[in-house]
């Protein structure tokens, strides 16, 4: 049976044709429109739309887009319940099947709505859920700046803000977008206050473990400032994070010897932890010393003499440290190293450097004026 073309008719006639179409597919629905108005008709149509979701993609898209278009012409106060019901149908129906079609329908609804309508939150959550089930997160908007703006535009409650950020984080993790996921998790944890930080205990724990696992994450001091992470002070997970933020390899080795079972329970690789701590330790050494002997590197990083040069090469590849190997003197000459932490002392150093540049530029400027006036 061909699908009716829902165009060039009144909203009431369109609803009646949808009713007739659903009825022909076996839905338990009257072919007569409700006396309660279009929003009642749509509530009944959405409730019965499961039968048409079993059709071919083209047929489903035609009929469901008709439903979407009718929902969008309603007054805002009548849309919310219908949108929630429609999203629930599209998210849950045969979960995992026909994801591209369900994403398309949800996307049509999302982009057809006024940008400031709070009900867009429900649709966006639906988009995230469907995208996560099929690895299609790249096909929906996930830019954190844009998500922040939507959260503000929709005037979301704290609870809903946490829900959407957590959904987005989990979807990005499932879709192997670790860098983006880490940023979203930091945003989520940063939205907690002293009053509700304890509620994010599990999220904070996950955030720390994921950061420690990430082979590209070396600067972790910003995590210590997050209130849910502060709430974990005194626990082993917080102690471990503190070691990765500012301590040396020897501190990690001692921690591991005393808490091997804990490290294993986190799913962390001791060997990977050792590799990361060697680099972090070397970064700290390079900040304080412009010349470092091979012997010192060997001792501090607990590696053999034949491993030093290979380690230096790998360290430079991370772009956390810039240095050259002086094989004659058996030393490393450092030109730059990234600070593991950026606190008051580092801000002062940055201020002093910028101020020096400013003074030098003023001298150059004055010299040029003197030459031009001569």
Swiss-Prot record:
**What InterPro entries does this protein map onto?**
ARM-type_fold, COPS7/eIF3m, eIF3m, eIF3m_C_helix, PCI_dom, WH_DNA-bd_sf
Q: Which residues form the signal peptide?
A: none
Entry's Gene Ontology cellular component terms: eukaryotic 43S preinitiation complex; eukaryotic 48S preinitiation complex; eukaryotic translation initiation factor 3 complex, eIF3m
- Could you list this entry's UniProt keywords, alphabetically sorted: Cytoplasm, Initiation factor, Protein biosynthesis
Instruction: Name the Gene Ontology biological process terms.
Output: formation of cytoplasmic translation initiation complex
Disulfide partners: none
The entry's family comment says:
Belongs to the eIF-3 subunit M family.
Self-association state and partner proteins as the record states: Component of the eukaryotic translation initiation factor 3 (eIF-3) complex, which is composed of 13 subunits: eif3a, eif3b, eif3c, eif3d, eif3e, eif3f, eif3g, eif3h, eif3i, eif3j, eif3k, eif3l and eif3m.
Name the record gives this protein = Eukaryotic translation initiation factor 3 subunit M
Q: Which organism is it from?
A: Xenopus tropicalis
Q: Which gene encodes it?
A: eif3m
């Amino acid at each position: 049976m061909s699908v009716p073309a829902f165009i060039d008719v009144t909203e009431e006639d369109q609803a009646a044709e949808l009713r007739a179409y659903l009825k022909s597919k076996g839905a338990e629905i009257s072919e007569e429109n409700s006396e309660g108005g279009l929003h009642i008709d749509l509530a009944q149509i959405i409730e019965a739309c499961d039968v048409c979701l079993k059709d071919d993609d083209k047929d489903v898209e035609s009929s469901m887009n008709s439903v979407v278009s009718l929902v969008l012409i309603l007054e805002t106060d009548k849309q919310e319940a219908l949108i929630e019901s429609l999203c629930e149908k599209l998210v849950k129906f045969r979960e995992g099947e026909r994801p591209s079609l369900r994403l398309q329908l949800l996307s049509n609804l999302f982009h057809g709505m006024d940008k400031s309508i709070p009900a867009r939150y429900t649709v966006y959550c639906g988009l995230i859920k469907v995208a996560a089930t099929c690895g299609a997160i790249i096909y929906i908007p996930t830019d954190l700046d844009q998500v922040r703006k939507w959260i503000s535009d929709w005037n979301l409650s704290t609870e809903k803000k946490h829900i959407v950020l957590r959904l987005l984080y989990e979807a990005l993790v499932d879709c192997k977008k670790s860098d983006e996921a880490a940023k979203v998790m930091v945003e989520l944890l940063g939205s907690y206050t002293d009053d509700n930080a304890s509620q994010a205990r599990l999220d904070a724990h996950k955030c720390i473990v994921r950061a420690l696992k990430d082979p590209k994450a070396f600067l972790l001091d910003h995590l210590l400032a997050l209130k849910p992470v502060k709430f974990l002070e005194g626990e082993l997970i917080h102690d471990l994070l503190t070691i990765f933020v500012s301590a040396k390899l020897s501190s990690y080795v001692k921690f591991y010897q005393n808490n091997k079972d804990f490290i294993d329970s986190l799913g962390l690789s001791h060997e990977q932890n050792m590799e990361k701590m060697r680099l972090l330790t070397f970064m700290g050494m390079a900040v304080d010393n412009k010349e470092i002997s091979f012997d010192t590197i060997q001792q501090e990083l607990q590696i053999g003499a034949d491993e030093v040069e290979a380690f230096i090469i790998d360290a430079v590849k991370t772009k956390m440290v810039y240095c050259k190997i002086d094989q004659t003197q058996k030393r490393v000459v450092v030109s730059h190293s990234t600070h593991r932490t950026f606190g008051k002392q580092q801000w002062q150093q940055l201020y002093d450097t910028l101020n020096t540049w400013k003074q030098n530029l003023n001298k150059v400027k004055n010299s040029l004026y003197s030459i031009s006036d001569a």
